[in-house]
């Protein structure tokens, strides 16, 4: 059975956009809902408003250590979507964990890994 998380898209630091992987930052609707462990996940995502039908996506839960982050964030990259989702409600179905979150030596090394992760979510 899929683990589902529903949340609202909120503003972030736009780091993903600057490295070619724009993300929607998710604030869970239910603050008491258990959040999966930090890491990178293959997920399906869709919007309550219907502007995104069920799409395969890549989600990170963690602190973004490559960029010296400290707060835990939930960020989803939807490969085939280019639009504004701020304020939208997204539903996320966790399919499988791809890897642990880790600190990369450079943003370029992170991008190289993200491209591998992207290939992995399609399988």
Regions flagged by a language model, labelled:
Residues 4-5, 10:
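Charge-rich, low-complexity N-terminal segments
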Residues 1-3, 53-54:
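Short coil-to-beta-strand transition motifs
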Residues 11-123:
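Phosphate/ribose-recognition catalytic cores of enzymes acting on nucleotide-derived substrates
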């Amino acid at each position: 059975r899929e683990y589902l998380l529903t949340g609202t898209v909120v503003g972030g630091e736009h780091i993903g956009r600057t490295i070619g992987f724009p993300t929607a930052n998710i604030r869970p609707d239910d603050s008491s809902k258990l959040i999966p462990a930090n890491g990178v996940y293959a997920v399906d995502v869709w919007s309550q408003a219907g502007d995104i039908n069920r799409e395969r996506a890549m989600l990170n839960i963690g602190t973004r250590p490559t960029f010296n982050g400290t707060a835990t964030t939930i960020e989803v990259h939807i490969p085939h979507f280019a639009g504004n989702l701020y304020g939208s409600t997204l539903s996320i179905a966790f399919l499988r964990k791809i890897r642990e979150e880790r600190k990369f030596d450079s943003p370029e090394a992170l991008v190289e890994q993200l491209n591998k992760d992207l290939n992995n979510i399609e399988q």
